[in-house]
């Protein structure tokens, strides 16, 4: 791929992203859709993905850290953006001036935000997190938590935009715990209402709940992995959403050689040829997000066939056995993650090998890997991060 700084790239089909979001919009109806684009939009590239999601049904965005929000604002995105995690108070002026909605789960922090906002003659917009069973961040849904949230709602420099929780098991078949979490949130909100507090945007549904639990939608939903075409688990009702992965990871063959029988490949001599073999070297490794855990286990698609990754994956390179494939040469295109002509090796397959989840596979693709964006099968943009 001549338009990239190196022969490794991720192709992102923006039409597929658009279709995934339209599917989500059709499912949730008129509810607010908060599209989660943290971690560089799960490895897809936040700027172009965010715009596409907003154009096709999303009304809001969510990120994890202040720099992710700044990137979106600097690119001219004006849609509401919430930060799901912690932001140091020294960034308060940035939050307030850029109208970034900060998650709050500590009274003293909220007071400091309020003070900063009053000095600027503005209000800090916040979402209040309630820990209904994730055990991560948020006020506990008890009397003490209620009193703290009521105190935050009374602060003169704070505008409470949202109240939310995060489900920990909504992608599992047994929804009992998710229903318990949901009940705690709705009971907490009722207690606020009984105290004269109305928060306009209540949201709890993540990808698993969006697919399986429409009764948890409240005022809005937060879609993450499903925007990118992957299901959160194998236990959700896939028939509720027709999704397609938008990202394909590709490279070109960098070298081809023949090795005699009983010759070793890569570090540690973990692979030895059993016969005369043809080995191709690919210019991608674990520094690119192609994990060392794939050593000797993954496969790629080349010339319409599968080829096995052999030996240990190196920092910048790995090797495949192409003995069974004719006429493999330098420059041939290889699919490391994706599908072609009925052959598939995607983030789910990779995650199974590595003992992880498809989310991590996508997020691992590093900034060394250029992103190529396509619409109508035409390249519309290329990003070389480094």
Swiss-Prot record:
Chain positions recorded as substrate binding sites: 136, 315
GO terms for cellular component: cytosol
GO MF annotations, alphabetized: alanine racemase activity; pyridoxal phosphate binding
A Pfam family recorded for this sequence: Ala_racemase_C
Signal peptide: none
Cofactor: pyridoxal 5'-phosphate
Any single GO BP term: peptidoglycan biosynthetic process
Superkingdom, natural source: Bacteria
Reaction(s) catalysed by this chain's protein: L-alanine = D-alanine
Keywords associated with the record: Isomerase, Pyridoxal phosphate
Pathway connected to this protein: Amino-acid biosynthesis; D-alanine biosynthesis; D-alanine from L-alanine: step 1/1
Transmembrane segments: none
Annotated catalytic residues: 38 (proton acceptor), 267 (proton acceptor)
This enzyme's EC code(s): 5.1.1.1
Sites of N6-(pyridoxal phosphate)lysine modification: 38
Family to which the UniProt record says this protein belongs: Belongs to the alanine racemase family.
Task performed by this protein: Catalyzes the interconversion of L-alanine and D-alanine. May also act on other amino acids.
HAMAP family assigned: Ala_racemase
Protein known as: Alanine racemase
Organism name: Clostridium perfringens (strain ATCC 13124 / DSM 756 / JCM 1290 / NCIMB 6125 / NCTC 8237 / Type A)
Lineage, highest ranks first: Bacteria, Bacillati, Bacillota, Clostridia, Eubacteriales
């Amino acid at each position: 791929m001549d338009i990239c700084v190196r022969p490794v790239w991720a192709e992102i089909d923006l039409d597929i992203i658009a279709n995934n979001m339209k599917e989500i919009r059709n499912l949730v109806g008129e509810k607010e859709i908060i599209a989660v684009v943290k971690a560089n939009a799960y490895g897809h590239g936040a700027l172009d993905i965010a715009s596409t999601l907003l154009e096709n049904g999303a009304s809001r965005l969510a990120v994890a850290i202040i720099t992710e929000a700044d990137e979106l604002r600097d690119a001219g995105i004006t849609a509401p953006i919430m930060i799901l995690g912690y932001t140091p108070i020294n960034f308060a002026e940035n939050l307030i001036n850029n109208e970034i909605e900060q998650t709050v789960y500590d009274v003293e922090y909220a007071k400091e935000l309020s003070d900063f906002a009053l000095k600027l003659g503005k209000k800090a917009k916040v979402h209040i997190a309630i820990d209904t069973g994730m055990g991560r961040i948020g006020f506990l849904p008890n009397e003490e938590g209620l009193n703290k949230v009521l105190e935050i709602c009374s602060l003169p420099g704070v505008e409470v935009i949202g109240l939310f929780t995060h489900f920990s098991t909504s992608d599992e078949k047994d929804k009992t715990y998710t229903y318990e979490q949901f009940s705690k949130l709705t009971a907490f909100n009722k207690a606020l209402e009984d105290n004269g507090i109305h928060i306009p945007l209540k949201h709890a549904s993540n990808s698993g709940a969006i697919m399986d639990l429409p009764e948890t939608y409240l005022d809005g939903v937060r879609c993450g992995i499903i925007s990118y075409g992957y299901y959160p688990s194998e236990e959700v009702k896939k028939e509720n959403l027709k999704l397609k992965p938008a990202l394909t990871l590709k490279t070109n063959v960098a070298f081809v050689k023949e090795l005699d029988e009983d010759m070793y490949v890569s570090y540690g001599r973990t692979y030895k040829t059993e016969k005369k073999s043809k080995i191709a070297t690919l210019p991608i490794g674990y520094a690119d997000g192609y994990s060392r855990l794939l050593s000797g286990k993954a496969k790629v698609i080349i010339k319409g066939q599968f080829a096995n990754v052999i030996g240990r994956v190196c920092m910048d390179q790995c090797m495949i056995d192409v003995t069974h494939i004719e006429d493999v040469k330098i420059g041939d295109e290889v699919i490391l993650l994706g599908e072609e002509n009925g052959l598939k090796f995607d983030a789910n397959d990779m995650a199974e090998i590595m003992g992880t989840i498809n989310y991590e596979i996508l997020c691992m693709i590093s900034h060394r890997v250029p992103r190529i964006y396509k619409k109508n099968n035409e390249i519309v943009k290329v990003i070389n991060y480094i």
